[in-house]
Amino acid sequence: MVEWHKIIEDISKNNKFEDAAIVDYKTTKNVLAAIPNRTFAKINPGEVIPLITNHNILKPLIGQKFCIVYTNSLMDENTYAMELLTGYAPVSPIVIARTHTALIFLMGKPTTSRRDVYRTCRDHATRVRATGN
C-alpha cells in the first residue's frame, strides 16, 4: 500500500509547487490526500470521470475551477500524463499523472516551468507504478 500522504508532504516541502492532490479513479473517485484548503482538495467525482473517459476534453473543471488542456496522454500506457494550464490569472502549469489506482495532481507556481512540474509529477507516478499501485 502506497502512503499517499508522504508524497503530498514531499511535494509541499518544495517551494516550486502551489497545490497537490492524489485522487482515486478506480473505485470511489475521491481525494485520498491533498494539501488542505487549496483548489485540489475540492476535487469531486464529477470532475474526475470526464478526465479519464473523455480523451477530447478541452476545458475541464478541477476543484471547481476551469483549466485548459495543453497535452492529453493520460490514458496512454507509455506517457500516462496530462498537462494543463489554469484558466484564470495568474496562469500556473498543472500536470495530472496516472498510476494504476490513482491520479496525481500537481500545480506549479506561476514562476515554475511546465517541465519542472511535469518531471516531478511523472517521477512520483513512475515510482508508484513500479510498486504495482
From Swiss-Prot:
Source superkingdom: Viruses
Keyword Transferase (UniProt): no
UniProt GO MF annotations: actin binding
Keywords: Actin-binding
Tagged with keyword Membrane: no
InterPro entries given in the database record: PFN, PFN_euk, PFN_sf
Transmembrane parts of this sequence: none
Function: More likely to influence phosphoinositide metabolism than actin assembly.
Family: Belongs to the profilin family.
Name the record gives this protein: Profilin
Organism: Camelpox virus (strain CMS)
